[in-house]
């Protein structure tokens, strides 16, 4: 039997530079990725460098609040 909650949880990563640069009117939206993280290994918020199709470059994607 499993004790408590599962260690793996599904998270959503969102582009941080798209949120700051809302100046572009022709923006195709905000880039979001869905992934999983292990809560025991990384208890803090996750930040990864991923490709953003709206910015056309690699940017930092941060974990959204639940």
Swiss-Prot record:
Q: Read off the InterPro entries from this record.
A: Ribosomal_bL33, Ribosomal_bL33_CS, Ribosomal_bL33_sf, Ribosomal_zn-bd
Family that this chain belongs to: Belongs to the bacterial ribosomal protein bL33 family.
Question: Cross-referenced SUPFAM superfamilies, in alphabetical order?
Answer: Zn-binding ribosomal proteins
Q: Which cysteines are joined by disulfide bonds?
A: none
What this protein is called in its record is Large ribosomal subunit protein bL33c
- Which source organism does the UniProt entry give? Morus indica
| A Pfam family of this chain | Ribosomal_L33
Which terms in the Gene Ontology molecular function aspect does this entry carry? structural constituent of ribosome
Its subcellular locations are: Plastid, Chloroplast
């Amino acid at each position: 039997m499993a004790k408590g909650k599962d260690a793996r949880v599904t998270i959503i990563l969102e582009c941080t530079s798209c949120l700051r640069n809302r100046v572009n009117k022709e923006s195709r939206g905000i880039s979001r990725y869905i992934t999983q993280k292990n809560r025991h290994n990384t208890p803090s918020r996750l930040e990864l460098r991923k490709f953003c199709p709206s910015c056309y470059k690699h940017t930092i994607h941060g974990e959204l609040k639940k």
